[in-house]
Amino acid sequence: MSTIGAVDILNQKTITSEVAASVTSKYLQSTFSKGNTSHIEDKRFIHVSSRSHSRFTSTPITPNEILSLKFHVSGSSMAYSRMDGSLTVWFIKDASFDKSVEVYIPDCCGSDKLATDLSWNPTSLNQIAVVSNSSEISLLLINEKSLTASKLRTLSLGSKTKVNTCLYDPLGNWLLAATKSEKIYLFDVKKDHSSVCSLNISDISQEDNDVVYSLAWSNGGSHIFIGFKSGYLAILKAKHGILEVCTKIKAHTGPITEIKMDPWGRNFITGSIDGNCYVWNMKSLCCELIINDLNSAVTTLDVCHLGKILGICTEDEMVYFYDLNSGNLLHSKSLANYKTDPVLKFYPDKSWYIMSGKNDTLSNHFVKNEKNLITYWKDMFDNTMIEKRRKNNGGGNNHNKRTSKNTDRIGKDRPSRFNSKK
């Protein structure tokens, strides 16, 4: 497992690949510090905290795993469903979540039903599609002021259909839904979510009785990527409400548990129960990078908004952060004592992320006042240069004026100092 070596960051005046990797590694380490980590104090956190601090409770805390966690594309809100049937929505106001608004919906799909998946409508700040392994897709409207959810409408697909996955395309034109092994469905969002197309799973996969394990849209919403239990990857073209199979690849030797797009459209990434992650070139569909040193099944993965960090969760309760460009390991974290199913999700507009806490709680990881890696490096460099000049000038009272002038000059020189080599 290749790791990032030490680089003297502060003596570098351009961002080379080595400097970028070192900055990223340092940034990730800082996100685990106490000052840059905050608990998301939802209903689950309150329950766990009250049980943990009670002297009169000896029974174990009942698990309540996260089933699906999604950010709105704007980064202004996120939603997640749990095994108890609840849906929690946060309208995010700050890094620590202290001022954020929580909307809690118990039994969001009705009693005895679980919200197996959810997806934000990217063209609306408060509309979510939810599925529950049933014949219905619920379109919910979340009200931030009244802290309630109302059902806009229900999409029905026939009594024997069991839809367990749904996904809006990035432009908000289409809603995709899928059962495990029967069909995928396409809805036209602009035409009141009318059903326009369906396709049998047997017509997509190479294997008989195959099962859908993962879905993803391309960044432009023109193609659909489907990962199967067999390890096959199918790519479909979506145009004018018609789905057409373009490519089938035997991508993995086990089920493909996750598919993610590089935000720049260069690559897509697949993770599998076979313990491997592959980075594929979007144009050639050739595998460009293999991460095969995880030693455990990949349960989920995500990519940061800059396309620099690949986060991977594995079945043995580990979280890994890799450099997506080089495949080198940047940082890792064991969740072995957390008693939780690992969860990792990057914000869509910054280098912060949400990760599993103990007993199925969630924690927010960030660096204060730093929304991405570039500003993190620039501010670190600036502060160090100012401190060096202050020390060189003696730092005494007799030199206050000269220090002030030097500081001003740093501000003027700054643009030329950060001309990066690409």
From Swiss-Prot:
Residues 388-422 are annotated as: Disordered. WD repeats lie at residues 61-100, 158-197, 207-246, 251-290, 293-332. SUPFAM superfamilies: WD40 repeat-like. It comes from the Eukaryota. PROSITE patterns: WD_REPEATS_2, WD_REPEATS_REGION. InterPro entries: Tex1/THOC3, WD40/YVTN_repeat-like_dom_sf, WD40_repeat_dom_sf, WD40_rpt. GO terms for biological process: mRNA export from nucleus; transcription elongation by RNA polymerase II. Residues 405-416 have a biased composition (Basic and acidic residues). GO terms for molecular function: mRNA binding. It is found in: Nucleus. Pfam families: WD40. Belongs to the THOC3 family. Component of the transcription/export (TREX) complex and the THO complex. This is Protein TEX1. It comes from Saccharomyces cerevisiae (strain ATCC 204508 / S288c).
